A protein has these predicted regions:
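Walker A/P-loop NTP-binding motif of AAA+ ATPase domains
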Residues: 1-144
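C-terminal alpha-helical "lid" subdomain
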Residues: 123-203
Length: 203
């Protein structure tokens, strides 16, 4: 939600290389050994031509081998991943994104030449985003009214808040978004955050 995928796409575009977004749900399997096989097929495909291979939520397959209940399968997956990263052809790039950097295997960290940290947008960025997101929508408030209270939110969360505020006004059959609509949208986002944190803590 902080622009990692967009940054990877721009990187590929600047280099004039094809951009391949790897969907993890197509890699991960409950069958023994199949996840490692799917990873191998992905890297074999990427070796056919110089490209930018992008993994989102990389921690799902690169988690520390000290974690998890099925240590043997986890080791198999991470070991396979380490081998294939080492075999990336010159001219090709691997970019991996995660929100759970503390869970990545230490050996995985050593395979990457560069690490880029993406922070949440600051107040100026929030102000700019709200202004652009709501420019074609009638509002009963100014973006400045909510800038400080939204400084800790990601771009993805800001997008959800704006869309939720629009939805509230539409369901109420009003053409403009009120201050209350936007506050309610922020409260909804806060509750969603809390639920996601609980789910993450229970895993």
């Amino acid at each position: 939600g902080t622009g990692k995928t967009l940054c990877a796409e721009v990187f590929a575009g600047q280099l004039g290389l094809p951009f391949f977004f790897v969907k993890l749900d197509s890699l991960i399997s409950s069958f023994l050994g199949e996840t490692a096989t799917n990873i191998r097929k992905t890297f074999e495909f990427a070796r056919r031509q110089p490209c930018v291979l992008f993994f989102d939520e990389f921690d799902a397959i690169a988690r520390s081998r000290e974690e998890g209940n099925d240590h043997s399968e986890l080791r198999r997956v991470v070991n396979s991943l380490l081998i294939f990263i080492d075999q990336i052809q010159p001219g090709g790039f691997l970019i991996a994104a995660t929100n759970l950097d503390a869970h990545l295997d230490p050996a995985i960290w050593r395979r990457f030449d560069e690490v880029v940290w993406f922070d949440h947008p600051d107040e100026a960025m929030v102000r700019r985003y709200l202004t652009n997101a709501l420019k074609n929508t009638e509002t009963e408030f100014e973006a400045e009214d909510f800038v400080q209270s939204l400084a800790d939110y990601s771009y993805a969360e800001l997008e959800k808040i704006c869309n939720q505020a629009k939805k509230i006004s539409l369901l109420d059959r009003r053409k403009s978004i009120s201050k209350k609509d936007f506050r309610d949208a922020i409260r909804y986002a806060e509750r969603r955050r809390m639920r996601l944190r609980k789910l993450s803590n229970n895993q």
